[in-house]
């Protein structure tokens, strides 16, 4: 399995997202310019220029016409995917951490960090069909009990009825997307012991996977918030992804830059590790990055995956045929 090495960013990667068809890959990094690639051969198609801060997250609409990005420059932006034109800017008074389109693309959930006197918040915005009619009003604003803790990820639940969030306070919360009422939150006993860094939904929205600095990833039932599985690894987990094809999960991570030694690379600490989703056992690893892995994404067809690292590279891996026959 020879990776395709994609160099388009000057700074560490933060997020990767495929479109629904799996032919396009969007990457975000700390260098202000989200980038679009062909997901098949890694060819760079273009960049989206307009942010002046690290871009933490992005999402693409179902028909691949719109892109939404969230940045440390205190804005979230809507873009025309094809032309690269900036369609609208949502301005906040705090860095924007996470963005996610609802099913149907008429709503988006955006999280903002704690900043000066502003508490961390989850905002629901209406997305107009015609960019000319777009406004910045929030339909709903949610706050976690500890407003100083960052909300690293918020995504839509099944049928846009709920919003699932997780972050620095280690708690996963499920909110009613209409009323803003807190419906469920993860139990301290079974939940993560350190910051939740990443969250990835299954293709059918029935369950989701969270990654944490406590060196585990956990699989949860989307409706009941029951803990289903726990995957334990040797490094803090920065990124997680679920295979849409096989019962596999992939985890990526590594020490924070300040704690890294050159031996970590040789010790296999910067591998993307694959686990059997059901048996919770490690089935393999993919090396390559010279530093922690910050972003992971499976192609929607399940036949390839990409990883983004602190080293500024995106590595695109098309699986060999023997991957599909792994037996434990």
From Swiss-Prot:
GO terms for biological process: formation of cytoplasmic translation initiation complex. PROSITE patterns: WD_REPEATS_1, WD_REPEATS_2, WD_REPEATS_REGION. The keyword Glycoprotein does not apply. WD repeats lie at residues 8-49, 50-89, 146-185, 191-230, 288-327. GO terms for cellular component: Cul4-RING E3 ubiquitin ligase complex; eukaryotic 43S preinitiation complex; eukaryotic 48S preinitiation complex; eukaryotic translation initiation factor 3 complex. The keyword Repeat applies. SMART domains: WD40. Its main location: cytoplasm. InterPro entries: eIF3i, G-protein_beta_WD-40_rep, WD40/YVTN_repeat-like_dom_sf, WD40_repeat_CS, WD40_repeat_dom_sf, WD40_rpt. GO terms for molecular function: translation initiation factor activity. It comes from the Eukaryota. Keywords: Cytoplasm, Initiation factor, Protein biosynthesis, Repeat, WD repeat. SUPFAM superfamilies: WD40 repeat-like (SSF50978). It is found in: Cytoplasm. It holds the Pfam family EIF3I. Component of the eukaryotic translation initiation factor 3 (eIF-3) complex, which is involved in protein synthesis of a specialized repertoire of mRNAs and, together with other initiation factors, stimulates binding of mRNA and methionyl-tRNAi to the 40S ribosome. The eIF-3 complex specifically targets and initiates translation of a subset of mRNAs involved in cell proliferation. Belongs to the eIF-3 subunit I family. Component of the eukaryotic translation initiation factor 3 (eIF-3) complex. This is Eukaryotic translation initiation factor 3 subunit I.
């Amino acid at each position: 399995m020879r990776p395709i090495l994609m160099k388009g960013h000057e700074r560490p990667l933060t997020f990767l997202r495929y479109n629904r068809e799996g032919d396009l890959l969007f990457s975000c990094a700390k260098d202000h310019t989200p980038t679009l690639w062909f997901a098949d051969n890694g060819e760079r198609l273009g960049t989206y220029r307009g942010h002046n801060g690290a871009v933490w997250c992005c999402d693409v609409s179902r028909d691949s016409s719109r892109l939404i990005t969230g940045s440390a420059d205190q804005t979230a932006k809507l873009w025309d995917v094809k032309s690269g034109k900036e369609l609208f800017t949502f301005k906040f008074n705090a860095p924007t951490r996470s963005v996610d389109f609802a099913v149907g693309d008429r709503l988006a959930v955006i999280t903002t960090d704690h900043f000066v006197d502003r508490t961390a918040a989850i905002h629901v915005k209406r997305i107009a069909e015609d960019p000319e009619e777009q406004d910045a009003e929030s339909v709903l604003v949610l706050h976690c009990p500890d407003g100083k803790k960052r909300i690293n990820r918020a995504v839509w639940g099944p049928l846009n009825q709920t919003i699932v969030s997780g972050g620095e306070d280690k708690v996963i919360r499920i909110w009613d997307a209409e009323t803003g009422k807190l419906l469920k939150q993860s139990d301290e006993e079974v939940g993560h012991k350190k910051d939740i860094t990443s969250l990835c939904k299954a293709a059918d929205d029935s369950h989701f996977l969270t990654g944490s600095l406590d060196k585990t990833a956990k699989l949860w039932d989307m409706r009941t918030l029951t803990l289903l599985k726990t995957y334990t690894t040797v490094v803090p987990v920065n990124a997680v992804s679920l295979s849409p094809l096989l019962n596999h999960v992939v985890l990526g991570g590594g020490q924070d830059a300040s704690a890294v030694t050159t031996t970590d690379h040789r010790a296999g600490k910067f591998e993307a590790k694959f686990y059997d989703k059901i048996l919770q056992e490690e089935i393999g690893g993919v090396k390559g990055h010279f530093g922690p892995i910050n972003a992971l994404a499976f192609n929607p067809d399940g036949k390839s995956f990409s990883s983004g690292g602190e080293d500024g590279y995106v590595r695109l891996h098309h699986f060999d045929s023997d991957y599909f026959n792994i037996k434990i």
